From Swiss-Prot:
Residues 1-23 are annotated as: Interaction with EPB41L1. Residues 47-62, 324-338, 648-661 have a biased composition (Basic and acidic residues). The modification Phosphoserine is found at S113, S128, S149, S632, S744, S746, S802, S921, S979, S1172. The keyword Zinc-finger applies. It comes from Mus musculus. A zinc finger (C4-type) spans 940-963. This is Arf-GAP with GTPase, ANK repeat and PH domain-containing protein 2. It is found in: Cytoplasm; Nucleus. GO terms for molecular function: ATP binding; GTP binding; GTPase activator activity; GTPase activity; ionotropic glutamate receptor binding; phosphatidylinositol 3-kinase regulator activity; protein kinase activator activity; protein kinase binding.
Amino acid sequence: MSRGAGALQRRTTTYLISLTLVKLESVPPPPPSPSAAAAGAPGARGSEPRDPGSPRGSEEPGKKRHERLFHRQDALWISTSSAGTGGAEPPALSPAPASPARPVSPAPGRRLSLWAAPPGPPLSGGLSPDSKPGGAPSSSRRPLLSSPSWGGPEPEGRTGGGVPGSSSPHPGTGSRRLKVAPPPPAPKPFKTVTTSGAKAGGGKGAGSRLSWPESEGKPRVKGSKSTAGTGASAAAAGGGGSAAVTTSGGVGAGAGTRGKLSPRKGKSKTLDNSDLHPGPSAGSPPLTVPAIPVPATSVTATSTQPLGPAPPITLEPPAPGLKRGREGGRASTRDRKMLKFISGIFTKSTGGPPGPGPLPGPQGLSSSSGSRELLGAELRTSPKAVVNSQEWTLSRSIPELRLGVLGDVRSGKSSLIHRFLTGSYQVLEKIESEQYKKEMLVDGQTHLVLIREEAGAPDAKFSGWADAVIFVFSLEDESSFQAVSRLHGQLSSLRGEGRGGLALALVGTQDRISASSPRVVGDARARALCTDMKRCSYYETCATYGLNVDRVFQEVAQKVVTLRKQQQLLAACKSLPSSPSHSAASTPVAGQASNGGHTSDYSSSLPSSPNVGHRELRAEAAAVAGLSTPGSLHRAAKRRTSLFANRRGSDAEKRSLDSRGETTGSGRAIPIKQSFLLKRSGNSLNKEWKKKYVTLSSNGFLLYHPSINDYIHSTHGKEMDLLRTTVKVPGKRPPRAISAFGPSASINGLVKDMSTVQMGEGPEASTPMPSPSPSPSSLQLPTDQTSKHLLKPDRNLARALSTDCTPSGDLSPLSREPPPSPMVKKQRRKKLSTPSKTEGSAVQAEAKRKMWKLKSFGSLRNIYKAEENFEFLIVSSTGQTWHFEAASFEERDAWVQAIESQILASLQCCESSKVKLRTDSQSEAVAIQAIRNAKGNSTCVDCGAPNPTWASLNLGALICIECSGIHRNLGTHLSRVRSLDLDDWPRELTLVLTAIGNDTANRVWESDTRGRAKPTRDSSREERESWIRAKYEQLLFLAPLGTTEEPLGRQLWAAVEAQDVAAVLLLLAHARHGPLDTSVEDPQLRSPLHLAAELAHVVITQLLLWYGADVAARDAQGRTALFYARQAGSQLCADILLQHGCPGEGGSTATTPSAATTPSITATPSPRRRSSAASLGRVDTTIALV
């Protein structure tokens, strides 16, 4: 009850309805004797006829009826009024002795009143409807629950009486229902909740006891007697924040035994099944209800009491006799379902949103068996489209990403958010700010994304709250686009230039684009605004089909996570010194030079700040070892710097790599692993090892710098993309590379014989070591000469197996080879193949190999030292190799594992063909739907067949599949046919078909049919072909030109200048009768194609080229249409011109005769389009489109 009271909000327009299950037990007057009570009860129940359909309103009040009525609970009328005085602490509730009721004046402020529904019109003039001016309660009023509701003795005097209109329609069925009864007229608005269905009889007003059953239990034994108790009633009232609860406990002393039980076994008569619950033991302590801080609330149960202090209510445990059920039966299934439903209302509700008001009281009443929530929480006055609740205020263990969405009302931001949250499209234009939440998986970790949709301009609180801001505008609404620029300026002024780390995204929505509302914001303008915003990404979405909706939020969340990690890394790197500190305090470790030089002591120490920071950022145990600097590094006594500045490529490549330091400064990727390694290039002439500071980044790049100082300042660094590389370890095969020869590595006893020789480093050069004997099956010799051919791969496999099977983890002698560069591998193959072929014995071949090494290196000790390395190779797909050497086996293996993991992550991040196909299909679905939405495109342009699936590009019309074959026979100079479902649809083709449509095409090509009947969907092919050829080939139905005498060239210029697509199409159709004179009196000698490109009109440019405009035409200054298209910033027009072979604007002013048909190389190269439209747009092509 305390939670329900605390949930009341002090608002004048909000009505809170809390359904409370209150069991009030009437205390009947003490009967003269138990025998009299027992004798009177059956008489009251014995011969009542049950007529559910009989009305009760027509019976006389004094007439007795032999009928039992089932009532669960009477109507509870909850009335709320204006807010009371805030901050007043209500007095405590305490039981008061029963006293004659007197009227209580209404207290100012909000109040909550509960009383029984009277039989007639509600009374007025007091707080309770039964209060009269005299102070005596009305005789026509009955208690909320009569004692027979839970098996108590029937009160005398009201056996057959009833309250009209309060009975259940089917009292005999024992159903439990909730119904809403009309409230009585009152000066304050209120709502009524009525529960009915329990058996109830008449009864006079008496005290009552609050009963809160905790859980269901077994019924009590028959014949349990009522426990006498003391009746009490409590009331409290006060101005402003008063609360009063009136209770009456127990039955009178000397109450008799219960009367005859109902013949209905196991049926509950209360909503909470309290009559089926076992009561607590007789020795149970009384139940104490603490004071409930209810603001301005008064509760009246049976009678009203004088005003006074209200200490906590003490509720005694109910009598066992009153708690047992009928005949000891259990509740029915319907009762349990109803109780579970009503209990779910209470348990699933939470506190209301934060707002002014007193804090909620105790969570519920507590009994010996535990606490139970008794009241429901606040019903939300304005439910949101998506639930938004306490995640805005509660602390959570998972990290939060705060996304703000800004835009105009008509920008489509509400539909965009709704699509992302629910996966469905809904037209929403919210004028109020909203808040949402959703869990997302970013970088393998769950994040709670808090989305805040701002209806107006951002404020200082919003700018400080958001981690990322998404600006949304509609591509068909110019005002929404201008609003985005204004909102960005306001956000920048609030946030300031010095504060970074805010991820931005610009989203253009295509939801409202249609034939009636075309696109007005071009792609170039949107991207220009995106560039001005700095560090902003541009997307075009369609909430109708879900195009790029999830991608926007996923990539923005990824940017937020990346920015956070970069800021943490920057904070950690600020504590680094400007140069690496070399101190003699570190432990020196001896290192042997690879060329057999002397041993030198080298000690290097690095500050621990970046190491700790990276461990905290990545939390990877495998990378901890890699973050520490190796204790010793191989270093030659004298080392010369390479004469070649760049060993991997040209100077331009070096400059491009070094220039990436701008992007890898404060915003570079997070290093996964970093340490000093020795490095040499496998393709350069300089084979010396050089010390490099190597870092493996989370974006799939491996960077190395000459020193850590260069890494901090992002200078003199080089990087390699691991996407197209692999990592290898000399002497080891890849883990999944299994030889096809199987377990034949021990042929001729190679493993058994050669693994017994172990070369040491001390005075003893060799020590016999026992080796596990191979299985007998592996020692079988081949019977033919094929063993000689298998000897070489088997020996290599034996080296790999012996390396992997070495118990100590060191390399065995079989795997100690020179570094496997391509040239060395060829020499080794030649040297190994010669003795194997001549001798035929692997033992002798290996002995000769060792002798060759002995001559080369001078001693077996130097052989061992020269081959003892911890290097690994990175090989690219282009053949480049990079050799790196670590300080130990553990560090090398850690580097190899980290690089392999990053290569796998880079490959997984690549857009697969399925994902690309899905993305393209979504884009094409949007384009095709836009084409179908054009006027007249629902039927075939020639025969009227519904849902055409083919299109004629240069006619701008949709045709059915039967007519498409005839159009294909006309040739591409008349009709370019393309399928809506089978072909690609680039943007320029989509714009042409949406701009023209079947309606405009028929007004041009089918203006005057001259009385000829148009074919239908059932017409034959001959009829269709005759009509189509007369329409498009013979131009019999072509609309006439105007009465003007101007030449076609001037009319076409005027139509292009007016951007009238229909007029341009009509003039181009008439121009097929003869040559089109495009000469106009333009001082710059521009053609209509120049003008269309200057206007950046994609549709007219494409139509002019399809109908034979000169793509190589130049103006007086020698500039082609491509110059004007680029000057206007239209990339689509430039691409169309380049597809048709338009020369660059830097050519000579003289035009060659073949310039119209021969594509020339442009002076300023432009990226080629990836769509298949390039193959269909050339003027001189003779291939039909299918």
